[in-house]
Amino acid sequence: MKLKFNVQNKSQADPYIFEDNGKFYLYVTAADGVEAYKTDDIFGEWEFLGTVCTVENKINYWAPAIIKYEDRYYLYYSCQEKKGQQNLHVSMANSPEGPFINPKKLYDRFTIDAHTVLTKSGLYLFYTEDNLEEERLGSRLFLDKLSDPYTPMHLRKEILTPSFDEEIYQRNRLGDGRNWHTLEGAFYFKEDNVHYLMYSGGCFMNDTYHIGYAYSGEKLDDLENLHFTKFTDNGKFSPVMIKNEIEEGTGHHSVIKLKNEYYAIYHARDVKPETEFNDRTARICKLNVKNGIITAER
């Protein structure tokens, strides 16, 4: 189901949903700054708030994610200089509507797709960066710990790696015969003592682009010591969501729990668009989460 917006013909790529004081906010990828929406009802109309975060001389703001910490709001996103690479940044605000100010670059290397989590053991940052050493080289999921919202501890722990051809982003990307794989868009949550780590795999322009997940039943709050197992169907590729007869490019989502029900907010394109506009737009579906199993009702 598509979300409803009070503006037309706008993309909502990489949608991140956030609830605060009875209102819901959605932060999305955009070229000139992080854009945001708000609503009182996620199934009702969303109001466009405009651009809520920019950094001087930076472009291409990807995959924003927000956390409330000690009564302030911290927005994590990647951006780049015109001829540079994507680097994760953080900015802060006194309101979820922004403006988000005081930007800081967290890493000098290529890093994207943050998800910040607070547990009893502290603040953790899931993100994506590259590993060129393995056979299935490419972008993988990593974990860091934060001493505060602005200060990474540089654990650089790789926590999930590619294992399927469906996770190939581009064949022979570097010209050496090896295929580039991509895992991105990490989203972590815990339900009934099971840790879930959802992600997107592959290339968003390909039919195999999908949402999958890994899980751990370990009774730990220090996330750096968890060992995640990718969900499969007896070792075979088994995504939660992938292209169907209605939508394609299905991926990069966030999750919210409302009245004991889980929902994924994700982006996709229409297989049969009704207009010339067919960019990635935000959609919602229910997730069934139980005993280490996640299924989607689309």
Question: Over which residues does each language-model region extend?
Answer:
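Carbohydrate-active catalytic/glycan-binding domains of CAZyme proteins
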Residues: 1-298
